[in-house]
Structure formats: C-alpha cells, structure tokens
C-alpha cells in the first residue's frame, strides 16, 4: 500500500528531502538537499505509535557488533562534501555510517552496520541540520572557562597555547617549555573538548623548540612579541619538518627584522599557517595579506575583523592596547596599534574569504577575539557577501550550497587538515570521532540544539531542571553528561606529537583523554584546503592600502546590520 504526501507534510514529519530548500537562521543563505539516503516508506521515527519498536524498526537478536550505540534519524547532514539527508549511526564513540538505519529483517534498504537493536539510543534528527564539531586553531589559553563557551557554540576542538592569564599568553598563543606543555595537558584533561598545544617557536637554535614538541606540543607558534625574525622562522620550520608538526606565524608588524617579502623568502616554500592574515591581528604592515597568493601558505582569519562592519575599526584600538601590553600614552605604542588597523585590507578580507583565498576561520580567544563566536562570525561573513556580491557564479540550482560548504570548511575540515587532525575530526565521515552538532534551522549559526562529544551529548539547550518536562523556560545552553566526570576522558582526545608518543613523555602525564598523534602536517599547500584553494596574484598599494587580486580591486561596504545578532541573544 502506498500513500502520497506533499512536500510540506513530508518535511514536517520526516524532515526535508531531495530538492527541498532550507534557510539558515535569518541569513540570506539557502541550502538545498542534494540527496536522500533514507528509504521512502521505511523511515525511522521514534516515539509512541512510531516505527522504532521491537520487531518493527528495532531488530531482535542482531549481533552486538552490528548494532548501533546511537542513531540520529533523518538528519540533514551539512558537510564540505555536500548536503545529504540520512540516518547517522554511531558506535564506539565514532561515526559508523551514514545511510538508512533500522531493522533489516523488516525494512528495505538498511545500510550494512546500521542495525537498530535493544542497545541503541535515538536522537530525532527530523528537521535538524547536523554538522561536524568546529575546530578553533587560534586559542590563547588564558582562562579554562573558554572551553565551555566554545563547546556551547559548536566548537569541539581547541588548538593553541598559553599558561593562563600571564602577560605572554595574553598576547601570544604559545605554551613555552616542556614543563608548561605537560602541565597544560594535565590541566585541560577535564575540559570537554579535544585539545592540542602549540609551543613557542621563536628561537634561532633548534634544541629548545624540539624539546617542546617531544613533550607533546602539536606545533610551534612564531609570534612577533617574541621576535619573529627570518632566522627564527627558518629554525622553526626546520624543526617542524623533522618532527612533522605545523608552524603558525604572527609576523613582524613593525617590519624591524624584515618586510613581507623577507618572511616569504624565509618560508622557502615550506608549509606554514599564517594567523590573522589580513593584519589587524598582527603581521607585516600593510601587506601581510599578500601571502594569500603563496602556494605553501595556509591562511586564516581571526574573528575580530569578521565581517567588516561600521564598528570594526573603532573597536580594535582598545583591544590592541590591552592584548599587546601597550601604553596608550606613548606615541610609539599608539603608532604601533594604529598601523595594524586598515579599512581597506579588512574590507578585502571579506572578499578573499568569499573567493576561497583565505582558507580558515578562528577566534584569537580573549586576545582580541571571542571564543564563542567563530561559528557565528563565519556565517555573518557569508551572509554579508551573499547580500553584497550576489550568488557565486559557480553555484548550480536555486541555492547557495557552494558558498555554504565553502564557509563551513573554514572552521571544520580545513583547520583539521592544516594541523594533522583530519583523520579524527573535521567532517561527518565514517570512522571519525562522533563530534557532532545539531541545529534547528532557525537558530543555525547562533545556538546549537545539541553538541555531541564522542557520541555522547555534552552540551544542549535545556530548560528548568525542576520542571516536569525538558522544555520550560529558561531554556539555555547547559552542560550535559558528556561534559562531566570520567565521560570527558572517554569521549575527548588530547592531540600530541608523534615524537612525544614514541618517546614516551606524554604517557607519563596520567591523562584520561585518549592520546592521538597528529600527522601529515608538512608538505601541505593551499591545494589541500577544501573549497578554499584559490591562489590569486596579490598586490597591496603601500600608500592607499588598496588590495588587488589578479588585478581586480577588492572592495566592499561595511555592514550596518548583521544576521545572527541581537534578536538571538536577548537572554
């Protein structure tokens, strides 16, 4: 027996299917479902009188190794590879498969390995968008509370450096020295996110740098406040090449030890991740943005300049003074701060993101950036470009799928690839850690509905705990069981260097989190940045600061209004 349903009714019951379109929050961005892996008429739905009952959608007697621990039914999976309607199966804290879940004895087309049994929990994904947990690659570990803000926003992996509110950490993302690396790995062991630490990379001799990597650092950070000279750049990159870790860099704003071309020469074609590539966050003034045209450079932005608005320039001066230990009464300190803030390059940054020439987005947490706004600022930038530049010429169909996938990749798969984590996190693929974020479309980019860590709900929108049901106000983001006790260690990862694992250093720290070595950090290039691999020929006018890509002037107007803003955060 068959029954016909119109699209609206079907979407209300089972979620959108192929060809349906969904608006993201209050943005101008519209996604369209590319394909549906579920089976019409045999959809999995949980609840009273619904499908997932014993002998119906739930199998009896299936081998335990084939039964899912958790199924997310009928979710709209948004990933850098496309937009797919699917059941998502999780087993052992990892994504087992995307496809059709259920009881193969009673249902058609059940994907192998996606059997629902008595050991299976269910999350109803109908009408929800599912993405990978975000990867923030520019964390100043100033306060541990950042982790809670990050996971509440949909970020599940934090990479960076620091030792707390020390003056050095307030300015630089470095965890200097083997002892600090060990202590910070131990201190962050209780935080419900994946962690990776960057050691200090500023030295003209390699011994101190290698020591930090062998203690567990997943990379090294070169920062101008510690002296980013050509000699330090070369030494740091040599150590990174030997030990297979990434190098992140904040270049010399004052051009004291060299200009942009000198740093590019010191890179010598070797892989390097350039932080806040536009330059307001730091870097050769006024033309560090030129590195967007270098094939060995992996460029990222931090969120203080994202997107360019009528308030962006005014906001930056005070932030710079505080973060970089400047004295506003000293003319030279004020000149240093003002040299980094340029309307023209900030405007160009918007356009370069839209072209896919800046590949990643990050926070610069508590050091000019806001750790809980990486996701929001990314989608605000995408919306601004959609409104000001129109549809991308490469788009197909009446949707913004390419632009949406491009911006999603900036805070998921691309930082994971850049830092050697993509075998574990960064996308919704079988075998990867089940760090997943579920969104109501109306709240997409602003407030996640559920955040899963290693397949267990760690954060969620939750109502009054003394209420009779979960939904009474105030409904706010709250920690769940995945963020508590020994579940944190069972569902999260401490990323370390391979050298530290092989040398046995990190095994002695007594960490509850699983130790995972980064790998494949060297030999990467812009070509490896998914949907963000554009390599334009870059020019910056030293007098007017105008930026051109392939001869085209990059210009856009500052936004006076943004989506995903005050209407979402009244309380």
Swiss-Prot record:
Cofactor or coenzyme needed: Ni cation
Keyword Heme tagged: no
Pathway terms, separated by semicolons: Nitrogen metabolism; urea degradation; CO(2) and NH(3) from urea (urease route): step 1/1
Locations listed in the record: Cytoplasm
Enzyme nomenclature, EC number: 3.5.1.5
Residues bound to Ni(2+) 1: 138, 140, 221, 364
Domain Urease: 133-571
GO cellular component: cytoplasm
UniProt-annotated binding residues for Ni(2+) 2: 221, 250, 276
Active site: 324
Top-rank EC class of the record's enzyme: hydrolase
Entry annotated with the keyword Cytoplasm: yes
NCBIfam families: PRK13206.1, PRK13207.1, urease_alph
Quaternary assembly: Heterotrimer of UreA (gamma), UreB (beta) and UreC (alpha) subunits. Three heterotrimers associate to form the active enzyme.
Family: Belongs to the metallo-dependent hydrolases superfamily. Urease alpha subunit family.
Protein name (database record): Urease subunit alpha
Gene name of the record: ureC
């Amino acid at each position: 027996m068959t029954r016909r349903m119109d699209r609206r009714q079907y979407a209300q019951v089972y979620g959108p299917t192929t060809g349906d379109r969904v608006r993201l929050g209050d943005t101008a961005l519209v996604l369209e479902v590319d394909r549906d892996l579920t089976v019409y008429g045999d959809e999995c739905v949980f609840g009273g009188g619904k499908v997932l009952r014993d002998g119906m959608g739930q199998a009896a007697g299936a081998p335990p190794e084939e039964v899912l621990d958790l199924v997310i039914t009928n979710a709209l999976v948004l990933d850098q590879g496309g937009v797919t309607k699917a059941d998502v199966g999780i087993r052992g804290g990892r994504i087992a498969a995307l496809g059709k879940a259920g009881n193969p004895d009673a249902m058609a087309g059940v994907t192998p390995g996606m059997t629902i049994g008595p050991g299976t929990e269910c999350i109803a994904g109908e009408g929800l968008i599912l993405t990978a947990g975000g990867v923030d690659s520019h964390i100043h570990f100033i306060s541990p509370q950042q982790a809670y803000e990050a996971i509440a926003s949909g970020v599940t992996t934090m990479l960076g450096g620091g030792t707390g509110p020390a003056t050095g950490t307030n300015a630089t993302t470095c965890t200097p020295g083997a002892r600090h690396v060990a202590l910070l790995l131990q201190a962050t062991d209780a935080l419900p996110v994946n962690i990776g630490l960057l050691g200090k990379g500023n030295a003209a001799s390699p011994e101190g740098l290698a020591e930090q990597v062998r203690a567990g650092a997943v990379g090294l950070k070169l920062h101008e406040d510690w002296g980013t000279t050509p000699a330090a750049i070369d030494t740091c990159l040599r150590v990174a090449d030997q030990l297979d870790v990434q190098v992140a860099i904040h270049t010399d704003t004052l051009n004291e030890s060299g200009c942009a071309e000198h740093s590019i020469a010191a890179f010598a074609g070797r892989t390097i991740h350039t932080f806040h590539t536009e330059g307001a966050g730091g870097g050769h003034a006024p033309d560090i943005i030129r590195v967007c045209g270098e094939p060995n450079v992996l460029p990222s932005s931090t969120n203080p300049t994202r997107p360019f608005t009528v308030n962006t320039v005014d906001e930056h001066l005070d932030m710079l003074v505080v973060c970089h230990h400047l004295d506003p009464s000293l003319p030279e300190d004020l000149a240093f701060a003002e040299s980094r803030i340029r309307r023209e390059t900030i405007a160009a940054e918007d356009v370069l993101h839209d072209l896919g020439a800046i590949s990643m987005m990050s926070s610069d947490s508590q050091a000019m950036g806001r750790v809980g706004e990486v996701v929001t600022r990314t989608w605000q930038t995408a919306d601004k470009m959609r409104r000001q530049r129109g549809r991308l010429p490469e788009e197909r169909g009446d949707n913004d799928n390419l632009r949406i996938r491009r911006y999603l990749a900036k805070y998921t798969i691309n930082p994971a690839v850049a830092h050697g984590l993509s075998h574990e996190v960064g996308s919704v693929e079988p075998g990867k850690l089940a760090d997943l974020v579920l969104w109501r479309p109306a709240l997409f980019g602003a407030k996640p509905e559920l955040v899963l860590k290693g397949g267990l709900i760690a954060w969620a929108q939750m109502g009054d705990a003394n209420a009779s049901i979960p939904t009474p106000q105030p409904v706010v983001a709250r920690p769940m069981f995945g963020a508590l006790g020994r579940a944190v260690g069972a569902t999260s990862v401490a990323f370390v260097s391979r050298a530290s694992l092989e040398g046995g250093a990190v095994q002695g720290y007594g960490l509850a989190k699983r130790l995972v070595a980064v790998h494949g950090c060297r030999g990467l290039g812009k070509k490896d940045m998914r949907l963000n691999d554009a390599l334009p020929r870059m020019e910056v006018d030293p007098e007017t600061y105008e930026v051109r890509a392939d001869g085209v002037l990059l210009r856009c107007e500052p936004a006076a209004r943004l989506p995903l803003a005050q209407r979402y955060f009244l309380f």
